[in-house]
Every structure is written in structure tokens, then in C-alpha cells.
């Protein structure tokens, strides 16, 4: 006969579990609590045809109106704040224990940054400017126009950071100064930078992201060019890629949260899917100012230029959060075939339907297909080869 409270065949004692009266354990979501406290408009989606047309609600401390965008993913690595500073307006000074990258959608203005009230720095920005605020530095944004609003997006790693510390007092009132990241250097926001191997460009301020110099990245396909951005010594990672008329990039996959913002192009789209049979595939048509967010883990996505000029996009993502080796740039497998253990589908391995969708969209835009050098069943012309040949 088995003794009560002892697991049969072992010497482990098993505590009796009450049949009733127990409650399910739940922990408060610090990020969701912050959103409610801010009373800010929230969008949960992964595709926005126009950042300029997103309807905003009041967000006075940011200088006017705003909204928070995030994907429907409980492992959300980042979010996106869409903010419009009213004409002549300014934000309230703030600092915080999460990283943030700004991209100016429209307008002009300035940002003042400081650790010490007596030693403030101010730099100016315009439409197309890209910059990062050093971790926990004080800053304030100003609209430089008295007649027009200034709109920007700010991609942050606030969701995981807030959920890690679960304390707003620490997140927004910690007085520690990360001087290894920013110590008041006069040239910090000068726009100067340094080029490293693997197309890595280190700079804290990019005055005009739609026209900055990019470098060849033939592994991602069809004459594409790219720069991997390292900014403000952040864990957050950004990059800019461009590809020629009548071409498309190879599909690849990675985790959720990469925000892709179209900087140039007159037509094109992204395909996004997770299932092997692509039964969940979405086609996201884009224009300048469209944003597509990678919504899921192991989510394939592929970008197509069906317009009549170059297509360039900016990708803003949370990065590795300190979990991987400290290499600059993108993931080591981003341009490696899945046949070799990477994340990328080579042109010869993609389903023919992908190219058919591309050629159909090209015809609608009156643009030629220029993928013959890469896709044998292409009905168009040779176009670029492996280099930057438009």
C-alpha cells in the first residue's frame, strides 16, 4: 500500500493541492500600465501605408499629438512612437532607461541634449534626419517652424525594458549618467562617422538618410547596396538598404520587431509570411513613408521595387539586447542560404509564384522586369548583375 504524500516508486514527498480556493498567478504588465498612464492612442498592427496619415491623439508632453504602434506579439521587442510637434511647439524635457532612435518624417526642428543643465548641446534636424538619444541623457525636441507641424517616429526598446524593471521611478527618474556612451563631446551630433568592415557606419546623427552613401551587398541580391548603422553605442540596430528599378531582394527571416520605413521609391511592396505553404502571406503595398513591421518570429519577408526609380528603406530594430557576440551590423545569417543554415531563400529556391506576383505588379506600374540575370524564368531583361549596375 502506497503511503499518503509519497510518490509511488520514489522517496519524493508530494504536497496536497487544494481542490478549490486557489487563484491564477498574474503579474502586472509594466508596459501596458505605462500606456494607460500616458493615455496615448495605441495601434496594434504591422502595416501602415503612410506614416504621414496615421491619425494621432493628444500627447501634450511630447509637444502636441502622438500614438504608439506595436505588433500583436507578447514577446514584443520594441515599439514605435509616432509624434507630431505642433507649430512652434516643444516637448517636455525627459530622460529614460530605454533606448530610442528618431527618424524625421516631415518638418524641421532641433533637439537639445544634456547630462548637466550648465552644459547643453543643440543640433538641428530636417525631413529625413536620423539620430539616437544616448541612454538616459536628458533631451527636449523643438519644432523649428511656426507654421507647419513636425512629425517623427521614435522606435524604442521600452517594452522589454519596462517589463524587466517594473518600476517607473527607475525608468524615468534614475540619475545615473552613462558617460561611456555620451560625455558631452562637442562633435557627438556633427554628422561625422567612421566606416568599418561589413558596411558598418558608426555615427550618432545622419542628416539625410534618404541620400546617404551606401555600399555593395551582392549577397542580398540584384545590385543592392546597404549600410549597417551603429549609433550612440546602443544595443538597438538600424540599417539602410536600396535596390534598383525592376528588381527585388531575396527573402529572409528573423525575429519580430524590425520596422521598415520606405525612404524612396514610386512603387513596390513587401511580402510577409510565416507558414511553409505561404497560406498566411500578406502583400503590403508601399510608397514613400510606408512602414512594415516584421510581426512574428521566423517570419519571412521580401521587398520588391516595381516603381520607376530606386527604392530605399530604413530598418529600425531592437537588436540583440546584449545576448549575442558584440559584432556591428546585422545578424551573421541574414545573407546566408537556409540550405547552409542561414535565414535566406536564394532566387533559384523561391517558388515561381513569387516572381509572377512581381511581374504582375510591374505591369500595373508600367515598369520593366530586370531580373533575368538571377531568375531563369524571368520574362524581362537582364538588368543588374552582382554589382551596383542600374
Language model feature labels by segment:
Residues 2-76, 167-239, 349-390:
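A short, N-terminal "cap"/entry segment at the start of jelly-roll beta-barrel domains
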Residues 61-68, 79-96, 239-255, 275-276, ...:
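Conserved short histidine dyad/triad with adjacent acidic residue
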Residues 69-75, 88-100, 130-131, 137-138, ...:
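Short, low-complexity cationic-aromatic patches
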Residues 85-87, 105, 123-145, 155-158, ...:
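Conserved metal-binding segment of the jelly-roll/cupin
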Residues 90, 95-127, 137, 253, ...:
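A short beta-strand-loop-beta hairpin characteristic of the jelly-roll/cupin
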Residues 140, 150-178, 302-361:
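A contiguous, mid-protein "functional segment" used to position or interact
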Residues 226-227, 237-240, 246-248, 258-260, ...:
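Eukaryotic modular interaction domains in large regulatory/scaffold proteins
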Residues 269-300, 308-309, 331-348:
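Glycine-enriched catalytic-core subsegment of oxygenase/oxidase enzymes
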Amino acid at each position: 500500500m502506497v503511503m499518503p504524500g509519497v510518490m509511488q516508486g520514489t522517496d519524493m514527498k508530494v504536497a496536497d493541492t487544494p481542490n478549490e480556493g486557489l487563484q491564477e498567478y498574474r503579474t502586472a504588465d509594466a508596459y501596458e500600465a505605462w500606456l494607460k498612464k500616458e493615455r496615448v492612442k495605441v495601434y496594434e498592427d504591422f502595416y501602415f501605408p503612410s506614416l504621414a496619415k496615421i491619425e494621432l491623439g493628444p500627447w501634450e508632453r511630447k509637444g502636441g499629438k502622438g500614438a504608439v504602434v506595436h505588433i500583436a506579439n507578447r514577446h514584443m521587442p520594441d515599439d514605435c512612437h509616432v509624434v507630431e510637434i505642433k507649430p512652434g511647439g516643444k516637448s517636455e524635457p525627459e530622460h529614460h532607461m530605454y533606448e530610442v532612435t528618431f527618424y524625421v518624417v516631415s518638418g524641421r526642428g532641433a533637439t537639445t541634449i544634456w547630462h548637466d543643465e550648465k552644459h547643453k548641446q543643440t543640433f538641428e534636424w530636417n525631413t529625413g534626419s536620423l539620430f539616437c538619444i544616448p541612454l538616459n541623457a536628458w533631451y527636449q525636441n523643438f519644432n523649428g517652424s511656426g507654421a507647419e507641424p513636425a512629425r517623427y517616429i521614435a522606435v524604442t526598446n521600452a517594452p522589454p525594458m519596462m517589463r524587466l524593471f517594473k518600476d517607473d521611478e527607475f525608468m524615468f527618474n534614475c540619475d545615473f549618467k552613462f558617460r561611456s556612451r555620451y560625455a558631452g563631446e562637442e562633435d557627438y551630433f556633427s554628422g561625422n562617422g567612421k566606416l568599418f568592415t561589413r558596411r558598418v557606419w558608426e555615427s550618432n546623427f545622419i542628416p539625410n538618410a534618404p541620400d546617404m552613401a551606401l555600399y555593395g551587398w551582392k549577397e542580398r541580391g540584384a545590385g543592392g547596396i546597404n549600410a549597417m548603422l551603429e549609433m550612440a553605442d546602443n544595443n538597438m540596430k538600424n540599417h539602410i538598404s536600396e535596390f534598383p528599378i525592376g528588381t527585388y531582394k531575396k527573402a529572409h527571416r528573423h525575429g519580430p520587431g524590425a520596422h521598415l520605413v520606405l525612404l524612396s521609391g514610386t512603387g513596390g511592396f513587401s511580402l510577409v509570411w510565416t507558414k511553409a505553404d505561404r497560406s498566411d502571406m500578406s502583400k503590403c503595398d508601399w510608397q514613400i513613408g510606408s512602414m512594415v513591421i516584421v510581426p512574428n518570429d521566423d517570419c519571412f519577408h521580401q521587398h520588391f521595387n516595381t516603381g520607376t526609380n530606386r527604392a530605399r528603406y530604413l530598418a529600425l530594430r531592437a537588436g540583440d539586447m546584449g545576448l549575442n557576440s558584440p559584432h556591428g551590423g546585422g545578424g551573421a545569417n541574414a545573407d546566408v542560404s537556409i540550405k547552409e543554415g542561414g535565414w535566406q531563400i536564394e532566387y533559384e529556391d523561391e517558388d515561381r509564384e513569387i516572381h509572377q506576383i512581381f511581374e504582375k505588379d510591374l505591369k500595373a506600374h508600367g515598369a520593366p522586369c530586370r531580373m533575368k540575370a538571377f531568375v531563369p524564368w524571368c520574362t524581362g531583361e537582364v538588368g543588374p548583375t552582382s554589382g551596383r549596375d542600374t
